[in-house]
A protein has these predicted regions:
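Phosphate/ribose-phosphate-bearing ligand recognition and processing surfaces
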Residues: 84-176
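Glycine-/small-residue-enriched capping loops at alpha/beta junctions
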Residues: 1-111
């Protein structure tokens, strides 16, 4: 199966997706936040909050997995992006954001997850420019799919139409 057939871009509420796993853009102390994190926690229920409180910490670029609890998704993979600063910090930050995607996909492979959805990690409160973050996300995901023996499908779940269209264009370019 070609790579493009294993990718999709949707404009949707990630908490409504009935797939194997969704990815959460968490903070390093795994404390309740707003945006995607707040929506996921609200829908998953108190059990998710309790589990993340016990876990206590996740470093930037790392990822951890929990059950989805009351979500339609079986699992939630939590990852922490760096806060965008740009300038001389940009290369290191880009590598860390790429690790968010790579480590989430690694956990997905290790847990036999075949369908996974990513939000636009880092583009909310962490202020990543959406075009920069999308390119990093897309390139990291495509690279992983090319190397992995696991035949998974990745959904880029976007809040805004413009973001969905950006991912759709990148998918079309891979399709040729």
């Amino acid at each position: 199966m070609d790579i493009a057939a294993r990718l999709e871009a949707v404009e949707a509420d990630i908490t409504t997706l009935a797939i194997d796993a969704i990815v959460n853009a968490a903070n390093s102390h795994l404390m309740p936040g707003g945006g995607v994190d707040g929506a996921i926690r609200k829908r998953a229920g108190r059990e998710l909050d309790d589990e993340l409180r016990r876990a206590g910490f996740c470093a930037e670029g790392d990822a951890l997995i929990t059950p989805g609890y009351r979500l339609p998704a079986a699992y939630v993979i939590h990852t922490v992006a760096p806060v965008w600063a740009g300038g001389k910090e940009r290369p290191a930050q880009e590598q860390t954001l790429a690790r968010c995607y790579a480590n989430a996909l690694k956990l997905a492979d290790e847990n036999n997850i075949r369908t996974i959805a990513f939000p636009s990690i880092g583009t909310g409160a962490y202020r990543w420019p959406t075009d920069v973050a999308a390119k990093i996300a897309f390139d990291t995901v495509v690279g992983h799919l090319k190397r992995s023996d696991v035949q998974s499908t990745v959904t880029f779940c976007c809040f805004a139409r413009a973001d969905r269209e950006r991912y759709a264009a990148m998918i079309a370019a891979v399709r040729g």
